[in-house]
């Protein structure tokens, strides 16, 4: 719809939106670094009258507080905050703007208090902002609150998705959680912004009208999610910190300053790793994987490639430069992605040229000689044991800064996963020269 402006967070596979009216804007589910929303508002010289949240997010920090710091916006949420500046999205909630009406529709399932927002004109629903309820190719996952509530939330999700069947086929659906989001349960790639008609054709969970089958398919699709999920709740309920108050990491070549810190090697070359560092290549899921192994209270230092440090400009973190400059500043993008998930204690940024690199022990299809691998893929994949899946190992490190002794004592010193990223990450934590990981294909394809 022309009225709706879409923004994407590639790192988290999430969407957020602006509804653009003639005189004002309404923002929906913005992330902590809400610069694109604020810049769009400045560009149009239109105020942001409301910030609507479909749910208290588990996977990222809200940008509502950054927006409220600049605009006199009304913050609309589905449950009470610790702040005084909010309005509840209850059964009486409605915004009337220039002939349009926005109302809330209770759609529990992803969370107990989840709501969707309906954009209407003259009583006709034009679009639904579905948050973590119905997504383009599935529904929002129902296991994030607590395992004991998964069954109840799944039942709620079934009833909530059925409410969407009451809308006309032409109604657009704008989900917050996109394809690849850990908050979603999906079946196959589909357009990001479907209509009700396309959902009825292509979204298997949306189509399913038998609850038992729906529940079985949803639960069986629930994979692992990063350890930091849930740690965002206090912030999103009002214990927030503006990005401008975060201590900015210092760029240094002094390798002694990061003693005692956890060191992250963010360089992208799979064939090398920084000595005594955890190897997490700086790709589109970097913040998620850091959040899988690093508690947000843990001080860290990050090694970046020299060329990226050359392009680093602190002003980009605070939205004090042109948006085009941020696009070429990979480190600022990475830091904002980390801030978005609550990882703030980044003390130092270190050039790759100033640290010692080790050649990683990897096996490719060309060098494979029949070694026995220990597969650390998720427990629902055929060759893995749940107790030593990547998720279990990473969560143990997240809590204890160490791996389970039972795992470290395994005779198999060869780790594998689908792409090599998770195996390389765990291998780098072990920091054992004998540990070899598969870095370019799964074990199955070697035979």
Feature-to-residue mapping (PLM):
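Active-site metal-binding motif and surrounding structural segment of the metallo-beta-lactamase
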Residues: 32-77
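Conserved beta-strand hairpin/beta-sheet module of binuclear metal-dependent hydrolase folds
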Residues: 1-47, 117-131, 137
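Active-site neighborhood of phospho(di)ester-bond hydrolases with catalytic His/Asp-centered motifs
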Residues: 27-29, 47-57, 75-79, 106-109, ...
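Divalent-metal (often Zn2+) His-rich catalytic cores of metallo-beta-lactamase-fold enzymes
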Residues: 155-245
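Active-site-proximal cofactor/substrate-binding loop regions of enzyme domains
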Residues: 38, 66, 75-77, 82-117, ...
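Core dinuclear metal-dependent hydrolase active-site scaffold
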Residues: 2-4, 17-20, 94-123, 166, ...
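Active-site metal-binding loops of divalent metal-dependent hydrolases
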Residues: 30-31, 56, 110-111, 131-134, ...
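Rhodanese-like catalytic fold shared by cysteine-dependent sulfurtransferases
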Residues: 90-92, 141-143, 198-230, 268-447
């Amino acid at each position: 719809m022309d009225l709706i402006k879409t923004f994407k967070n590639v790192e988290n596979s999430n969407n957020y939106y602006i509804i653009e009216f003639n005189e004002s804007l309404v923002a929906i589910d913005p992330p902590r670094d809400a610069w694109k929303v604020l810049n769009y508002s400045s560009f149009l010289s239109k105020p942001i009258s409301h910030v609507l949240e479909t749910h208290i997010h588990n996977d990222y920090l809200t940008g509502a507080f950054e927006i409220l710091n600049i605009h006199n916006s009304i913050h609309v949420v589905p449950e009470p905050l610790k702040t005084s500046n909010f309005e509840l999205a209850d059964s009486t909630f409605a915004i009337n703007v220039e002939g349009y009406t926005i109302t809330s529709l209770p759609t529990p399932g992803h969370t107990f208090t989840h709501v969707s927002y309906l954009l209407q004109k003259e009583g006709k629903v034009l679009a639904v902002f579905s948050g973590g309820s119905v997504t383009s190719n599935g529904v929002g996952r129902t296991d994030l609150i607590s395992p004991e509530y998964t069954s109840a939330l799944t039942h709620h999700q079934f009833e909530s998705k059925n409410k969407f069947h009451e809308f006309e086929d032409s109604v657009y659906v704008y989900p917050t959680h996109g394809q690849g989001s850990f908050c979603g349960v999906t079946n196959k790639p589909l357009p990001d912004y479907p209509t009700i008609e396309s959902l009825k054709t292509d979204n298997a969970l949306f189509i399913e009208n038998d609850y038992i089958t729906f529940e079985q398919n949803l639960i069986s699709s629930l994979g692992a999610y990063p350890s930091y999920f849930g740690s965002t709740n206090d912030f999103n309920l009002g214990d927030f910190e503006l990005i401008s108050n975060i201590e900015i990491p210092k760029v240094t070549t002094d390798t002694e300053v990061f003693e005692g810190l956890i060191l992250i090697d963010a360089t992208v070359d799979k064939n090398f790793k920084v000595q005594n560092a955890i190897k997490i290549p700086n790709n589109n899921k970097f913040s998620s994987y850091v959040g899988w192994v690093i508690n947000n209270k843990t001080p860290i230092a990050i090694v970046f490639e020299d060329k990226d440090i050359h392009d680093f400009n602190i002003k980009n973190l605070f939205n004090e430069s042109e948006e085009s400059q941020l696009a070429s500043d990979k480190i600022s993008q990475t830091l904002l992605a980390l801030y978005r998930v609550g990882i703030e204690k980044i003390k130092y940024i270190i050039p790759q040229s100033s640290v010692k690199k080790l050649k990683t022990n990897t096996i490719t299809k060309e060098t494979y000689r029949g070694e026995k691998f220990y597969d650390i893929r998720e427990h629902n994949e055929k060759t893995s044991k749940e107790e030593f899946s990547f998720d279990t190992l990473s969560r143990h490190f997240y809590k204890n800064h160490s791996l389970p002794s039972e795992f470290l004592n395994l005779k198999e010193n060869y780790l594998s996963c689908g792409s090599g990223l998770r195996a390389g990450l765990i291998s780098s934590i072990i920091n054992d020269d004998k540990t070899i990981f598969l870095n370019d294909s799964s074990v199955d394809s070697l035979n």
